[in-house]
Every structure is written in C-alpha cells, then in structure tokens.
Amino acid sequence: MGWQIASSRLTHDFSALPFKMKELTLLIKITPQVDGSGLRLILQNRFNHTALLFDELIVSHDEKMSDAKSITRGKQKQIAIVGNGAVHTDALPFEVIAGQPLYFRMRALQKQTYADFSCVYDETFYNAIMAGTKNAAPHLPHNWQARKGWFCISCLEVWTNKKTPIIELTGDSLAETGMIETGLIKQLLNQAVVVNTGISGNRLLHDAPQDGPLYQTFGQSLIKRATQSTDPHPHPIIALIGSNDLVLPLIDGQSAHELVTPGQYLAGVSQLKQILDDRRCPLILTTIPPFSPHVAPQQENILLDAQQRRLLINQELRRFEWVVDLDPWLLGNDGGLKEIYDFGDHLHLNAAGGMVAAQAIMQKLSQLGYEKSF
C-alpha cells in the first residue's frame, strides 16, 4: 500500500493577473484515475507571497455534497497554505473509484488574493465554478467553450495497493484545454495516470512576454520548465508545443521581435529531447497542428509566412520516430484546421479534434512499445 497520484493538473502563475475575492466558494469536480481507500490533496500557493486560509474543504461522491467529509490539515478544519509554498492535507479514509468523479468544495470567509490558478474547458473529467460569497451553493456549468477555473488544488493522491504508471501531457493550451487529455484518459483509465502540465500561451523557446498581464501568465519556455523540473521519477512526456512560437508574434508587440525560424525551432526540439533523455523521460512530440486565426488584412502575409514555417518545421520533424504527425488527421484543404475539429477560433481543438489527436498519440505509444508497460 502507498500513496499514488490519481489526478494532477498544474496550477499556473497568475500573479500578474490575480483574483481578488472578499469571500470565496469553490466547487470542483476531479475524476481520479486510480482506485483507492483514502485520499489527500496537494494545495499550492507558490505564486503568492501571503498565506491563504480556507475555512472549509470537504469532499463528496456527488455534486450535492450529500455524503461530504471534511478534509483537514493537522486535524484542523481551517487550512493555511504558506506564502510561496504548498501543503499536503491530512489523509482521509474515503472510497475512490477510477473514473467516478469526486466533488470538492472550498470556502474562504476572508478577503484574499489568489494567484495559483488552474483551468479546463472539457468537462468530462474536470469541472469547476467559483462564487464570491461564502454561503453560495453553485452548480457546475455545462459549456465546453467556456473556461472553468479553480485555485490551489494541484494534485489528488489516493491510498492504494496499485502502482500505476504516469504519463505527462505538457505544452500549451492544446494540452491545457483538456480536449486531448480527455481522449487519453478514456483510453488509459486503469492503465496509466495522465497528468497535465500544459500552460495556455506557452512556447518552446521563449518565456512569457512581459508587455501585458495576460501574456505574463504564459509561463517559462518549455525548455526552461523541463530543465527546472524537480520530478525525480522517469515517465513518458507527450508535448504539444510550437503554435505560440509561430502565432504569438501576430498579436503581441514584444513577441514580434522573437520570430522563430525553422532552424531555431528544430534546434530547440533537439535541446528539449536531450534534457528529457538526461532525466530518462522519453519524449513523444507532435507536429505543430494547423492554424488559421483571423488577422487584420495588413497581417495576412505574416500569417502566411508563419503557416509556411509550420510546414517546413513539420517536414523535418516527421523524420523522427518519436514524433506524432497530426496533419493527416487535422489538416483541412484550406491549410487550416478541419472544420469538424475546430474549437471555433481556427487555432484550438474541439472535443472531436481532441479525440482524434489522442488516437494518433495512442498509435505512436503503441508503435514505440509503451503500451506494454501499462
């Protein structure tokens, strides 16, 4: 018996765009990927200098919280998370079934600022809603095109006799939205745990631009994140990255001076591969998916150039056996995403697009022999 990660989603640095709440009620659905007889949470406050207090943290098997149990820390119901830190909650005996959602409600009675933020669009395995009052009884939303976000909860661990392998899904919003993650979890449930470290706006080569609060949430470059990771356990890492290296210069002034050539991108891929090889974490990289976002007329030539660089980069990436070619699945006749897989912005994937991308990734995992270890 031991503790095993059953669900994990990275909390992002929103210190440049913090949430200031007089009071807070959070309702979060998290679906464990491992069975267990007990649970505990990791609560993050890494991007806030001030401690956070939660006056209530409870868990239930249903959204109405009908069998709710208190989650404590140090046997106290009020939980403090130190500034720039993280805490484990106490262990709670509680039945956990892989694929069956758990519902967590958090309340804070005092005015606080929250900077550790996680979000999702696909509602299959995660969902959340927040309210700015302490006595709210919110209901989870059902709108796959709307962002659902929560604070502080980054990892659910369960007490189990199983040892389930970890697969990390990382990169940019193509990972973060949950569309591809959902497809992978559906195919790997009870075989492997998919953990998500995707960050919206993330790039392979460059850190977040600093010329706007939203841009500042885009995180450090994936190369830097891979270098600084403290995870000592080898595991496969699936990366969806590169779209923002090409597209961000179209919308952001600072990024316009960070145009990436195919040679620079491919050198960055080689560097990422070496970093992960040194960590004994096999890299499974996808080609850069098609994109055709709406741009102003004066930017059309810049967009065409970015699309051409995408084609040149992907042409070289296909030479590597550890690369998943998404173009046969996603590329439309107009050079952008197929309409049936388009989220609506000609850049991101809808649920159907996430499922076919996950299918392509699963085929590559099988070709590389990883299914034998699941």
Listing of model-derived features with the role each one plays in the protein:
Residues 1-170, 175-182, 189-190, 297, ...:
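N-terminal secretory targeting modules
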Residues 100, 235-237, 321:
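Conserved acidic residues
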Residues 156, 163-270, 294, 348:
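Conserved SGNH/GDSL esterase-like catalytic core that processes O-acyl groups on lipids
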Residues 168, 195, 284, 322-324:
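Hydrophobic/aromatic beta-strand patches that form the interior of the parallel beta-sheet core
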Residues 214, 247, 288-374:
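Catalytic His-Asp segment of secreted/periplasmic serine-dependent ester chemistry enzymes
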Residues 269-273, 314:
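Generic structural signal for well-ordered alpha-helices
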Residues 279-282:
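A short helix->loop->beta-strand "cap" motif at the edges of active sites that frequently abuts
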